[in-house]
């Protein structure tokens, strides 16, 4: 958190897990909140869930760089190995793969803007939890998140049933947020079955994503404009 906050506006973040054994499942572009553990017990920001993908750690670094929350690929690998050692990792997935929760439209809060975590969050719980953002503690936390960001931060986002924050936040829309370059690359790679569109090459180190209509020529930064 502190490293990403020091980088300024990050736009997209790869919230990785040291193991790719269990996929993270949520509605596309639903809110994903960052919660600090004890003694802070606070919400320090949020992003919108773009997708989950199991990736080699080097590809995660190549696609997202310091948006992985580390200043270098070497430090990222050291952190992965340290966490795996602490948790007694014995994964069935390829050893170099990590679980990547890819987030866009990320907003991080300064300490003075941290939000009190849900009052019904179980003590010592370290696993993700889902909340109805239309009522109760879910509604309070999400409302306070929106109060801390510019009105246009998620203006192009349809969070739909994932938030249901009420009429005063406007009716749900179907326009999705722009993907960052890393999220675009992973989205296109997965859309083509991790294979080259021309040669059917499946070697990830030689694959890259490109725009059909160049982004500089107002081509959309979306999966259907990629190959």
Model-predicted segments: where are they?
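Short, hydrophobic/aromatic-rich beta-strand segments within well-structured domains
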Residues: 30-36, 101-102, 196-198, 227
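Short, cationic low-complexity segments
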Residues: 120-146
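Structural detector for hydrophobic anchor residues on beta-strands
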Residues: 43-45
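Short, flexible loop/turn elements at secondary-structure junctions
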Residues: 36-38, 51-53, 105-107, 213-216
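Short, charged surface segments at domain edges that flank catalytic/cofactor-binding sites
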Residues: 16-19, 154-198, 213-224
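Histidine-centered nuclease catalytic patch
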Residues: 47, 52, 198-227
């Amino acid at each position: 958190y502190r490293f990403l906050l020091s980088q300024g506006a990050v736009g997209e973040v790869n919230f990785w897990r040291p193991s790719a054994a269990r996929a993270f499942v949520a509605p596309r572009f639903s809110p994903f909140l960052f919660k600090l553990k004890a003694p802070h017990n606070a919400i320090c920001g949020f992003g919108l869930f773009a997708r989950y993908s199991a990736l080699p750690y080097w590809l995660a670094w190549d696609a997202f760089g310091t948006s992985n929350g580390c200043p270098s690929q070497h430090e990222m690998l050291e952190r992965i190995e340290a966490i795996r050692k602490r948790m007694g990792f014995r994964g069935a997935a390829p050893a170099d793969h990590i679980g990547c929760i890819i987030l866009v439209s990320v907003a991080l809060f300064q300490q003075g803007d941290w939000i009190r975590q849900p009052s019904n969050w179980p003590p010592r719980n370290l696993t993700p939890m889902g909340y109805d953002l239309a009522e109760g503690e879910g509604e309070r936390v999400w409302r306070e998140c929106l109060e801390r960001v510019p009105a246009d931060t998620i203006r192009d986002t349809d969070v739909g049933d994932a938030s249901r924050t009420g009429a005063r936040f406007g009716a749900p829309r179907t326009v999705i947020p722009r993907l960052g370059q890393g999220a675009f690359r992973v989205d296109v790679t997965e859309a083509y079955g991790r294979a080259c569109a021309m040669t059917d090459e499946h070697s990830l180190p030689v694959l890259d994503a490109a725009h059909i209509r160049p982004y500089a020529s107002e081509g959309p930064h979306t999966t259907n404009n990629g190959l």
